[in-house]
Amino acid sequence: MKGIIFYKNSYEKAFEKLEEIINNYKELNYSITQYKKSRLDTVITFSNGDYWQIKKANEHSRGFACNIAYIEREIEKAIVDTIIMPTIKAKTYTGFNFW
């Protein structure tokens, strides 16, 4: 599964959300196999193959694909509808949540 956390202005809030996700995986006994943290590209991969990244939601966020997305509530509806929602691809499980 691939997940993306989309944020508007606060990278720190998006990283807090990623830390929540990391804790959930730790409770399921999945270890981290790759961890890359930078302001422009934060990526984490777990031992079960799941992949999470943090992306800023703007006009340049096109071209990504994921099965699940966490979307910051402050992001404009037009960006959500035209840019973020098309990135969510159907698999056996698909979803999005606002945080």
Please give the residue ranges for each predicted region.
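Phosphate/NTP-binding elements of NTP-utilizing enzymes
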Residues: M1-W99
